[in-house]
């Protein structure tokens, strides 16, 4: 199993579909920017959200939204419009979060819309609820605000 984290922008609003077996899936088309040499490239990924996961977030996911996705990655092949073989990345989404570090101001929308999006929306890992107003105002990471003292023998290399 290949597991990965992707950070990117939605290329379109989420699409809700039903499989032939009657299972519900919401598809996100995610553009992930990467730099190859001096050239920027965008890798397009299809992110599948199965069943009713993240339903509270879906009304706030719009084209241009910056998101963080974690899940099982798979590579799929298909024949392009010109007849040449192509490859795409597919993600079975385990975790979906809004990316508060978005560099696109239009992706967030108005302050009122952002406030509605932050109200009681489960956006954390394993469905934990976060106080997004305070999280947007400060950097939060492991050990944030703690005074760390390391001795040279603590470093393993």
From Swiss-Prot:
Residues 1-100 form the SSB domain. Residues 105-117 have a biased composition (Basic and acidic residues). Residues 99-131 are annotated as: Disordered. CDD domains: SSB_OBF. This is Single-stranded DNA-binding protein. GO terms for cellular component: nucleoid. Gene3D superfamilies: Nucleic acid-binding proteins (2.40.50.140). GO terms for biological process: DNA replication. It comes from the Bacteria. Keywords: DNA-binding. The keyword Transcription does not apply. Homotetramer. The keyword Calcium does not apply. GO terms for molecular function: enzyme activator activity; single-stranded DNA binding. InterPro entries: NA-bd_OB-fold, Primosome_PriB/ssb, ssDNA-bd. Pfam families: SSB.
């Amino acid at each position: 199993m290949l597991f990965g984290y992707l950070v990117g922008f939605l290329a379109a609003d989420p699409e809700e579909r039903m499989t032939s077996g009657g299972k519900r899936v919401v598809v996100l088309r995610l553009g992930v920017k990467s730099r190859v040499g001096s050239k920027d490239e965008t890798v397009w990924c299809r992110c599948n959200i199965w069943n009713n996961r993240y339903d509270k977030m879906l009304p706030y996911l719009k084209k241009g939204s910056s998101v963080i996705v974690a899940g099982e990655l798979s590579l799929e092949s298909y024949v392009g419009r010109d007849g040449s073989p192509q490859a795409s990345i597919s993600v079975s989404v385990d975790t979906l979060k809004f990316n508060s570090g978005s560099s696109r101001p239009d992706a967030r929308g108005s302050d009122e819309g952002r406030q509605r999006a932050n109200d009681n929306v489960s956006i954390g890992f394993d469905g934990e609820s976060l106080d997004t107003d305070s999280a947007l105002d400060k950097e939060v990471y492991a050990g944030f605000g703690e005074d760390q003292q390391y001795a040279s023998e603590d470093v393993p290399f």
